[in-house]
Amino acid sequence: YISPEIIDFGFEEKWAVIDLIMKQNNNNLPDRTIQYCSKKTPATYCRNVGRRRRWEFSLDKNSVDKEILNDDKIWNFLSKWITPEDATIERKTIYTFKSLIAKKWRKGRVFIAGDAAHLSPPFMGQGMCSGIRDVSNLFWKIAYCCNFGHKEKLLKTYESERLKNVKEYIITTINMGRLLNSIGDTNVSNTVKEEKDGSKKMTSIKPPL
């Protein structure tokens, strides 16, 4: 087996995820995904396929899951947007977002990728994307070694190339999540720096793919 040792970046949050089906089209709801940056209760609204809509909202780490998923509690939270007359609850669950990377991604003929190798908060939508990048990096290397007699050292580049990139994405995602959860706090806003022309600049993820 591969060593279970992990790097923990210390970010862990509970979020409720509520999927609903609208009984009829509600023109008052946004026709796009929106992130509500609130110090009290950060939330996300997703305009999904057809009449499906999703709300996600941050929970206190000491909250009781069973109580949070009570329908009355859910509708109370959603009351600023919709009521039970507008939609039915299709699914309700709680996710715990974590920030972890396995220290070893290979042992002999066994490799790990995706969620088996790393876990990221969802704020940049890069969890599954990173897993796809893992496989895209690895599959052709295995094929070259098995079918064309390439030296095994090629396989060693999988972990060295992917781990650094995933790490940078996770760190950036954590910072994004902290911003969403602290918006309006001067401790956060004062850290935003402007260019000389007054514009704000975001640099690319490093190291590159």
Show which residues each predicted segment covers.
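Surface-exposed loop/turn and secondary-structure junction residues enriched for glycine/proline
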Residues: 9, 23, 36-39, 48-49, ...
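Residue-level detector of alpha-helical recognition elements and their boundaries
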Residues: 21, 33, 60, 93, ...
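Helical substrate-recognition/capping region of FAD-dependent monooxygenase/halogenase enzymes
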Residues: 76, 144-209
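Conserved mid-domain beta->alpha element of the FAD-binding
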Residues: 89, 95-175
